[in-house]
């Protein structure tokens, strides 16, 4: 992605893995008696642990495909005169156009799926690295719910400030500049943390003027996967991470995505997956107060989709939400900027409904629809990736031997992980293994669930 990158000092790998081993042993000792006494009921929901690991692997792989595909078109089309007209299906496979700030992207000149082959690494981005951070903190603290202090300490340790960030060159000819890969509300929250603030005060509009932006809805979806089948517990786990950067309607929308991810374990690839996802979205939208802006936006986009006889013509609905919300302002929403939570929530629903459960089509529409396009493409890529599982994703993109490694130190720092002696590199399979341990803990501590003595099934 760039010719030079500064790697911070890497230490204490052995110490980390020893701590992880002790944590696993501690979890085993704590739960052996509970597992021995657990009564399994035929009516209980059962989750195959190895299958769940494959699904978590698929979440990271699908999210990375969606993220890096969406980054090609990110902020290219935001409804301003200088960026019009919007993209359509006809633009797929054609040359990328500059973002509204005037730059292209270094990783692709063509609007198409961006796939990283084995031997190379998927780069971290703000759509993936904060979820990685939160999963790491849960494993580190052996906790089912993070405290405000744990979140603050984790952010300060693993993210850069604007002053100590490495120098970054977007293109070979670019002038190097410091880049901490934090923007909008994330950046505001970190500055507040440096001043001693902790969540939820880091999203208080009194101090954080960007708390109505998109940040939380792209950094917290993983909490749904850490609490399968219990969306209310997932939302409780995500309460502070969401309110690290979001308040009001932005926080409500983040809850919506967490809810959908929590119940996604019940879904599998099928001819009716699109309809199942639509029903799940309708259920998740019950979280919204009846007269709230997110509720009205959801109902408008859903109604426009349902009434559109051509289910390939997603552009018709995109143009309608542009007119209704950006040009005219309706349903209590006044458009401010292309990072707004609400306009991107509406845009994400377009790709969810018209994508109809098809991984490729959903990512394609999300990348073309406009505004902050890498966010819905990453969100739905991750959700569908989880539903499909890693093995099925690789069949969908069989033309490429897809990479399973993740370069977390592209954007963040101080993570005690390496792959083939390369610091800051992780593997999706190992990430899924660690996250399954978190799921085990959450189910036993928060959901009165059981794990059988063979560690093969989770009973909820």
Task: Annotate each language-model stretch with its function.
Residues 1-13:
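N-terminal secretory signal peptides that target proteins for export/translocation
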Residues 31-36:
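Boundary at the C-terminal end of the N-terminal hydrophobic targeting segment
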Residues 71-115, 128-130, 148-169:
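Active-site-surrounding "flap" and adjacent substrate/cofactor-binding loops of secreted or lumenal enzymes
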Residues 61, 120-126, 130, 135-254:
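Active-site cavity-forming subdomains of large catalytic enzyme subunits
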Residues 47, 185-213, 220-231, 239-244, ...:
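Accessory "access/gating" subregions that flank catalytic or transport cores
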Residues 65, 69, 76-92, 246-249, ...:
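Catalytic phosphate/nucleotide-handling subdomain of diverse soluble enzymes
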Residues 458-460:
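Conserved small/polar residues in nucleotide/adenosyl-binding loops
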Residues 18-28:
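Bacterial N-terminal signal peptides
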């Amino acid at each position: 992605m760039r010719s030079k990158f500064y790697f911070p000092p890497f230490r204490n790998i052995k110490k980390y893995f020893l701590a992880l081993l002790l944590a696993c042993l501690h979890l085993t000792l704590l739960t052996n008696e509970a597992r021995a006494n657990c009564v399994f009921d035929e009516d209980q929901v059962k989750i195959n642990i190895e299958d769940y690991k494959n699904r978590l692997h698929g979440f990271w792989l699908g999210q990375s495909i969606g993220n890096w595909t969406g980054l090609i078109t990110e902020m290219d089309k935001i409804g301003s005169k200088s960026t019009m007209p919007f993209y359509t299906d006809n633009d797929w496979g054609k040359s990328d156009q500059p973002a509204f700030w005037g730059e292209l992207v270094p990783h692709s000149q063509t609007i198409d799926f961006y796939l990283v082959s084995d031997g190379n690494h998927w780069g971290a981005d703000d759509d993936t690295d904060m979820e990685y951070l939160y999963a790491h903190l849960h494993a580190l603290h052996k906790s089912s719910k993070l405290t405000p202090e744990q979140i603050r300490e984790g952010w300060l340790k693993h993210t850069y400030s604007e002053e100590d960030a490495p120098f970054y060159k977007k293109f070979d000819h670019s002038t190097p500049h410091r880049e901490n890969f934090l923007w909008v509300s994330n950046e505001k929250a970190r500055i507040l943390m440096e001043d001693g603030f902790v969540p939820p005060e880091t999203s208080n509009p009194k101090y954080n003027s960007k708390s109505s932006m998109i940040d939380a809805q792209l950094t917290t979806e993983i909490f749904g996967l850490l609490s399968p089948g219990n969306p209310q517990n997932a939302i409780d786990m995500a309460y502070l991470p969401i309110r690290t950067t979001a308040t009001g309607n932005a926080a409500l929308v983040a809850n919506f995505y967490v809810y959908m991810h929590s119940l996604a374990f019940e879904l599998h690839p099928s001819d009716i997956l699109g309809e199942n996802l639509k029903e799940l979205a309708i259920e998740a939208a019950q979280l919204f107060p009846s007269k709230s802006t997110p509720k009205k936006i959801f109902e408008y986009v859903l109604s426009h989709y349902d009434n559109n006889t051509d289910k390939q013509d997603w552009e018709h609905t995109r143009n309608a939400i542009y007119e209704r919300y950006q040009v005219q302002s309706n349903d209590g929403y006044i458009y401010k900027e292309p990072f707004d939570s609400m306009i991107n929530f509406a845009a994400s629903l377009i790709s969810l409904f018209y994508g109809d459960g098809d991984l490729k089509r959903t990512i394609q529409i999300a990348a073309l629809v406009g505004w902050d396009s890498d966010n819905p493409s990453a969100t739905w890529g991750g959700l569908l990736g989880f539903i499909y599982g890693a093995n099925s994703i690789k069949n969908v993109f069989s033309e490429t031997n897809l990479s399973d490694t993740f370069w977390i130190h592209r954007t963040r720092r101080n993570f005690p992980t390496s792959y083939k002696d390369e610091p800051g590199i992780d593997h999706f399979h190992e990430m899924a293994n660690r996250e399954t341990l978190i799921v085990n803990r959450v189910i036993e501590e928060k959901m009165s669930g059981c794990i059988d003595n063979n560690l093969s099934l989770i009973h909820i």
